[in-house]
Amino acid sequence: LIFAFLIALFIRTFFFQPFYIPSSSMEESLLVGDRLFVTKFTYGYSKHSLPFSPNISDKRILFSSPERGDVIVFKTPEDNDTDYIKRLIGLPGDKIQMLNGVLNINNKPIKREFIKNDFVLCGGTKIKSNFYQETLPNGKTYLAAYSEKNSSKDTDVYLIPQNKFFFMGDNRDCSQDSRYLSSVGYVDKINLVGKAQILFFSNNEEIGNLFTFWKWHKSIRFNRILKFIK
């Protein structure tokens, strides 16, 4: 039993770690009730690769730079303990700004195409939103939701420091992310936990949970099981 525990701990620390999505900040890419695997080796290792993040070193070994557009789990700079999952938007040295409701990277608006008008979950309430397919400078595409009411208000320019990264949720007006400098802000490379890779299970908890087995045929999102994260 102890040997099995040590094997599981080794895999969790160095290879794959499961995570659960509790909020709607990344809808529609990630939904509340999604369960996914994060690869721990993609960006190398730091103290946050270990259980309970022991304060043993402020260095990162075998570091490999993340790519713009990656969906990443990281520890929030506010407490270096809480796990957040967001999309990487800004790299060290970048200038990031929301201007006229459009994401600008290094003084250029990104390409985007209107896809649909639909409802998106925000704090338990469904908000009417416009969905756009956004294309980052490296060609990475994803679907982002903008509330009809808020529409991501204009911001100052964020200048990303060295060894720091800027993250945003795909559900733009329902995401606590790097735009909020006092609570999230710029994320140090030490705080990166891993890259979100694949969904292994998904359950719509508005319909039922894992104990209400008679609702599984409706609550389990079978079309999301073993789906790669883009």
Regions found by a protein language model. Give the residues of each.
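N-terminal signal-anchor transmembrane helix
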Residues: F19-S29
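Secondary-structure boundary/capping signal
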Residues: P18-F19, D34
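Soluble "head" domains of membrane/secretory-pathway proteins
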Residues: E28, V32-K230
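Hydrophobic membrane-insertion alpha-helices, especially the h-region
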Residues: L1-F14
